[in-house]
Regions:
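Sec-dependent N-terminal signal peptides
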Residues: 1-2
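Short helix/turn-capping signatures at newly exposed starts of structured segments
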Residues: 9-67, 92
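A cross-family detector of function-defining hotspots
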Residues: 46-87, 127-165
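Long, charged/polar, surface-exposed segments that mediate recognition or autoinhibition
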Residues: 80-143
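Residues at beta-strand starts and edge strands
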Residues: 89-92, 166-170
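Ser/Thr- (and often Asn-) enriched beta-sheet segments in non-cytosolic proteins
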Residues: 93-95, 152, 159-161, 171-173
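Short, low-complexity, Pro/Ser/Thr/Gly-rich segments in the mature regions of secreted, periplasmic
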Residues: 168-184
Length: 184
C-alpha cells in the first residue's frame, strides 16, 4: 500500500494546489532546524515514506517578503511544503497536503498514505509516539478539523494545524509556538 508513495519527486506542486498558509502567525518563531537537516533525519527515520528535495515556489503578490515557500511532490495527490525564514533558512512551518481523488476506491488508499506521511511528520516532533499512536492522533485531528479552514491543537512548544478546504484538499501542519511565562 505504501509503495505507491515510495517514489518521491522534487517537482513543486502547481501554485493553485498549495494554498498559502492562512494560519501561519505573523512573527511566529522558527524551529531551530533547516529543511536540509529536517529531510536528512526524516528520511533516515522513514525510509518507506521519503520526502524529496524541496523546491522554491514562486512568490505571489500577497506572500510575505520575509518567507520563502517551498514544496516537494510526494505523489500525484500528496505534497510536503514548508515556509522558511528568509536569511536563515529555518523552518516556520512544515505541511503535508492531501488533494482528494475523484475515484472513491483510489481515494481510500490515497488517504491512508497521506495519514501515514502526516503521522511520520508528527513523530519527528513527538518521537515517543508509536506509529499507531501517531496515526490515531492524526485521524483525531483530521476529524476535529473536518470542514474547518483552521483547527489547531497545542502540544508543548508546537501546534498542529488542520486546514480543510473540502474538495481542494486538507493540509496538516506542524509549527513552533512561543511559550510565555505565566505571571505569578
Amino acid at each position: 500500500m505504501l509503495q505507491a508513495a515510495a517514489g518521491a519527486w522534487a517537482d513543486p506542486p502547481p501554485t493553485e494546489a498549495t494554498p498559502a498558509a492562512p494560519y501561519l502567525l505573523a512573527g511566529a518563531p522558527t524551529f531551530d532546524l533547516t529543511v536540509v537537516k529536517f529531510r536528512e533525519k526524516y528520511n533516515r527515520d522513514n525510509p518507506k515514506l521519503p520526502i524529496g528535495e524541496f523546491r522554491a515556489i514562486p512568490t505571489a503578490e500577497d506572500d510575505s517578503p520575509l518567507l520563502t515557500r517551498a514544496a516537494s511532490k510526494l505523489n500525484e495527490n500528496l505534497y510536503a511544503s514548508t515556509a522558511l525564514e528568509k536569511g536563515t533558512g529555518k523552518i516556520k512551518t512544515l505541511q503535508i497536503t492531501h488533494l482528494p481523488l475523484q475515484q472513491a476506491t483510489e481515494e481510500k488508499a490515497a488517504r491512508a498514505i497521506a495519514i501515514s506521511y502526516m503521522a511520520a511528520l508528527m513523530r519527528q516532533f513527538e518521537p515517543a509516539l508509536t506509529v499507531e499512536q501517531s496515526q490515531n492522533k492524526v485521524n483525531s485531528l483530521l476529524e476535529k478539523g473536518k470542514g474547518s479552514r483552521f483547527y489547531q491543537q497545542q502540544v508543548g512548544a508546537i501546534r498542529y494545524v488542520v486546514s480543510d478546504n473540502g474538495d481542494k484538499g486538507v493540509t496538516f501542519a506542524v509549527e513552533p509556538i512561543k511559550l510565555a511565562l505565566s505571571e505569578p
